Amino acid sequence: MRHLLSTRDLSRDEAVRILDVAEDMADVGTREIKKTPALRGRTVVNLFFEDSTRTRISFEAAAKRLSADVINFSAKGSSVSKGESLKDTAQTLQAMGADGVVVRHPSSGAPHTLAGSGWIDAGIVNAGDGTHEHPTQALLDAFTIRRRLHGSAARGKGLDGTRVVIVGDVLHSRVARSNAWLLTTLGAEVTLVAPPTLVPVGVGSWPVTVRYDLDAALRDGAPDAVMMLRIQAERMRAAFFPNPREYARIWGLDDARLALLGPDTIVMHPGPMNRGLEISAAAADSERSTVREQVANGVSVRMAVLYLLLSGDGKADR
């Protein structure tokens, strides 16, 4: 694997391999010393042109647990804020000897541009580009679902027949896009539920079912997992729904809807959460919730991605 730019690029075998290596990395996390020398001598640069806390910290923790050297680059206060181009930044990192670059950028397609430009000879990981994709978030979501379904017998398995309902601001969600492609590649059945104003143009070409009635989707679909998406108000330049209270009433996972879910249905959220809007406090804190698991699993999955990207070997050094 040379780059990770989109879940759409992954075959089923490649996706399962990443999840299986992530299981090895999760084992590393249970040790007294949570480190492996797998990427000793390698340099990973976290190149973030957008604000981020959990994703950047997760990638930093992942690289350090693999014994890589980590450089954190923020656009604020850097030469980028003075007008430096992506090309010049990439060539600077090339001169510094970066082996892997984790990129978050407000423009959709920026990681693809970097990977195909020839400006830098490094493995590129897309950590979120505009409203396009967020591949490692989808991988950690799939990892979380697979672990909940199969436990210790998860290795080598996909998500065949698993029913996943993704609810909320699909229009602005790179998480929804990446999950739509990855989960279906792994064999899951994916249903998107959103207000009509928050469904993107072209969704008919996605391998999903689209519905607008959350109660009907939960009742008829008997989902194994319900994933609530954050309302991304910072990306909205118009009114996409009447008001927050109305949104929560029609499309939020409240206590009443939580009580109607099947006994083994899990509740997911990529974070950060707007409690009381897309998800109630009771749902977020319930035993069904995988929110904290997703954060922990994110480190293991990102370790797997960096390992496969920079070592070229599918077997983790135990």
From Swiss-Prot:
Pathways involved: Pyrimidine metabolism; UMP biosynthesis via de novo pathway; (S)-dihydroorotate from bicarbonate: step 2/3
Enzyme class at the top of the EC tree: transferase
GO biological process: 'de novo' pyrimidine nucleobase biosynthetic process; 'de novo' UMP biosynthetic process; amino acid metabolic process
Any one GO CC term of the record: cytosol
E.C. designation(s): 2.1.3.2
TM ranges: none
Keywords assigned by UniProt, alphabetized: Pyrimidine biosynthesis, Transferase
Stored PROSITE patterns: CARBAMOYLTRANSFERASE
A GO MF label: aspartate carbamoyltransferase activity
Residues engaged in binding carbamoyl phosphate: R54, T55, R104, H134, Q137, G271, P272
Domain of life the protein comes from: Bacteria
Catalytic activity of the protein: carbamoyl phosphate + L-aspartate = N-carbamoyl-L-aspartate + phosphate + H(+)
InterPro entries: Asp/Orn_carbamoyltranf_P-bd, Asp/Orn_carbamoylTrfase, Asp/Orn_carbamoylTrfase_sf, Asp_carbamoyltransf, Asp_carbamoyltransf_Asp/Orn-bd
Any one Pfam family match given in the protein's UniProt record, by short name: OTCace
Function, in words: Catalyzes the condensation of carbamoyl phosphate and aspartate to form carbamoyl aspartate and inorganic phosphate, the committed step in the de novo pyrimidine nucleotide biosynthesis pathway.
Subunit organization: Heterododecamer (2C3:3R2) of six catalytic PyrB chains organized as two trimers (C3), and six regulatory PyrI chains organized as three dimers (R2).
PANTHER family: ASPARTATE CARBAMOYLTRANSFERASE (PTHR45753:SF6), ORNITHINE CARBAMOYLTRANSFERASE, MITOCHONDRIAL (PTHR45753)
NCBIfam families: asp_carb_tr (TIGR00670), PRK00856.1 (NF002032)
The name this protein goes by in its record: Aspartate carbamoyltransferase catalytic subunit
Species for this entry: Clavibacter sepedonicus (Clavibacter michiganensis subsp. sepedonicus)
Gene: pyrB
